[in-house]
């Protein structure tokens, strides 16, 4: 699979670790990954009150899902990020840089008021394209 970052001088450069657009030329499978939270496999919640720890667990959960489908984090082309506090933007992108090599996936981040558990600070869903 070939993934390419799309940029334009007509659009302000991203302020975080994401691409304006991501183009994929591939024959393969599209994988839609549900919203991942900081819940570990044993049911406990990682990093209660710690956005970096929660973001890291979310990324580990994304990684486990995409790897189970036969891909890698490099195959993730799009993420939607839901946060309880937009002031965590820099901390979240610091962790994302550890998991997403350039070209970073296209991304939307929105602040929401509630999640399925009051301890959750972040949730991310993703789309991956896994080449043959």
Predicted ranges, named:
Residues 1-132:
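Short, polar/acidic, helix-capping and beta-turn segments at strand->helix junctions
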């Amino acid at each position: 699979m070939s993934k390419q970052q799309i940029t334009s001088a007509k659009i302000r450069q991203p302020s975080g670790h994401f691409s304006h657009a991501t183009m994929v030329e591939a024959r393969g499978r599209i994988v839609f990954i549900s919203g991942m939270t900081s819940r570990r496999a044993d049911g406990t919640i990682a990093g209660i009150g710690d956005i970096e720890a929660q973001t890291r667990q979310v990324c580990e959960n994304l990684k486990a899902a995409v790897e189970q489908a036969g891909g890698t984090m490099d195959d993730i082309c799009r993420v939607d990020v839901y946060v309880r506090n937009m002031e965590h933007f820099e901390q979240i992108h610091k962790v994302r840089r550890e998991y997403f090599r350039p070209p970073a996936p296209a991304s939307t981040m929105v602040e929401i008021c509630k999640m399925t558990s009051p301890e959750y600070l972040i949730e991310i869903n993703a789309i991956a394209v896994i080449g043959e």
